[in-house]
Amino acid sequence: VKKIVFSIFNDNVDQNHKSTNDFKLSQFKKWAPRLEFLQREYANKVGADYVLHRTNTTDYNSIQFEKIIQFEQYAEQYDAVLYLDFDVVINNNAKNIFEMIDLNTIGVYPLERMKLKGNHRDPEYSKLRSFLRQDNFDNQNIFCKTCAKNAMLLLDNQIGTNKLYNTGVVVGGSEVIKRLQFGENLESLNTLLDEARDDCLYPIEISKHFVYNNEVYVTYLIEKNNIPYTDMGIQWNFILDKFQKEPVDSAYFFHCVNKEFERTLL
């Protein structure tokens, strides 16, 4: 099986997104050599090629689209593909993901829009009411992104789930990746998102935050086309952010959304 692990990086991204503020960019510049080393070392460990794409694209959202398009392009050359955001730190206990995830499926970690109990990232009903009253949503809010995906599905006469797939870590075999057809449908996905924003069951406080987004589109495509997927589990995409600041030893990949790399690299 011919395998590849890849990531994408630009240390001069436009500062027009909350993921590209001064602190986060400076952290990337400081830790880039170590991040690349660990990802490359992991690829070697699992018998895969490794490529770090140093893109010239400076728009954050465009880079997010670029990574999924590259994911599809590698499926034309390789039997199995693993994409890692460049803020994903490999723990030294990480197993071979190509052996742990069914490569007849897309392996992703789903975040759920709402549960009454469970994951502490899930917004409580009372908090949602408060957000609506105070107009506190933003376009990176998981609830808004899931609503956008479901609004797109409603225009196709389909009922969506409460899931949104985080694309910081994505793995799959070439045949199932080819079923995504993200790149060739990007223009029509943008058009459908625009329609979903304008013709929407959701309140304006939510729908005004519907924006072009790779996670919205990937989840939409998987659900619309019934593409087989595997919930890879939190250990493969252990998100470190304002809700979960400290790493745990049992995780394989730390997804440092907060860019506080010192917590995992020191």
Regions found by a protein language model. Give the residues of each.
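A structural signal for short, well-ordered beta-strand segments and their strand-loop junctions
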Residues: 5-6, 51-53, 82-85, 107-109, ...
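Short catalytic/ligand-binding loop motif for oxyanion handling, primarily in non-cytosolic enzymes
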Residues: 14-15, 58-60, 90-93, 98-99, ...
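A conserved donor-nucleotide-binding helix/loop in the catalytic core
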Residues: 58-82, 91-98, 106-109, 165, ...
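Short, well-ordered alpha-helix to beta-strand connector turns
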Residues: 78, 86, 104, 250-251
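Conserved donor-nucleotide/metal-binding helix-loop-beta segment in metal-dependent transferases, i.e.
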Residues: 90-141
